[in-house]
A protein has these predicted regions:
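Active-site proximal loops enriched in glycine and acidic residues that flank catalytic Cys/His/Asp
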Residues: 93-94, 125-128, 161-164, 172, ...
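Hydrophobic/aromatic ligand-binding patch that stacks against planar heteroaromatic rings
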Residues: 113, 149, 178
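Amphipathic alpha-helical segments in well-structured domains
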Residues: 104-107, 143, 172
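Conserved thiamine diphosphate
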Residues: 144-171
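Conserved internal helical-beta-strand scaffold that buttresses enzyme catalytic cores
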Residues: 1-90, 96-137, 153, 157
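A short beta-strand-to-alpha-helix junction
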Residues: 138-142
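Structural signature of the thiamine diphosphate
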Residues: 167-190
Length: 190
């Protein structure tokens, strides 16, 4: 909800009206929770206007990742973006789902292939150590970090304290610079 209002600019009135009992979606409805609905807007930055999309995110954890990658690839091709600089996927994960859902590994494995590559994705992991089926973080995985599974594609992993906003911004800028330079995935574990 925070991302929808404070980053994408969705009005709080519009957001909260979706929670009213008599609110009806336009088009077909999946019956999923309202805050999983997508949204897109244009954001004004110091370097100009940027179009930002938050894809519909069904309750099936992480299943949206290959959909986003495909959407980005299609947009890159439509824009004739051979350098893959104009459309960039940013994927947000929970730590338990990142290391526990096979679709994450499948998406990572496709990341550098000619047919599916998008020039690298920026992965942001909210490492809150909350998995729906694990009450003790020691039971959530066999590795020290949830990001260890990404070592299979040898992408950099930046571990940053989410309580240090300046370091989070530094990590985000570094991730963007890496992605633009090397056209490969990078992970911010926060």
């Amino acid at each position: 909800l925070n991302l929808l209002v404070n980053v994408l600019g969705k009005s709080p009135k519009e957001l909260f009206s979706e929670f009213e009992e008599d609110y009806e979606l336009e088009g077909a409805s999946t019956g999923d929770v309202k805050y999983h609905l997508g949204f897109s807007s244009n954001i004004i930055t110091p370097n100009g206007e940027v179009h930002v999309s938050l894809n519909n995110n069904p309750s099936h954890l992480e299943i949206v990742n290959p959909v986003i990658e495909g959407s980005v690839r299609a947009r890159q091709e439509r824009l004739k973006d051979k350098n893959k600089d104009l459309v960039i996927p940013i994927l947000i994960h929970g730590d338990a789902a990142f290391s526990g859902k096979g679709v994450v590994m499948e998406t990572l494995q496709m990341s550098q292939t000619r047919g599916y590559g998008v020039g690298g994705s920026i992965h942001v992991i909210e490492n809150n150590q909350i998995g729906f089926t694990t009450s003790d973080p020691r039971d959530s995985r066999s590795t020290l970090y949830s990001t260890d599974v990404a070592k299979m594609i040898e992408c950099p992993i930046l571990h940053v304290n989410g309580d240090d906003p300046e370091m989070v911004v530094f990590a985000a800028k570094l991730a963007c610079e890496y992605r633009y330079t090397f056209k490969k995935d990078i992970i911010i574990d926060m």
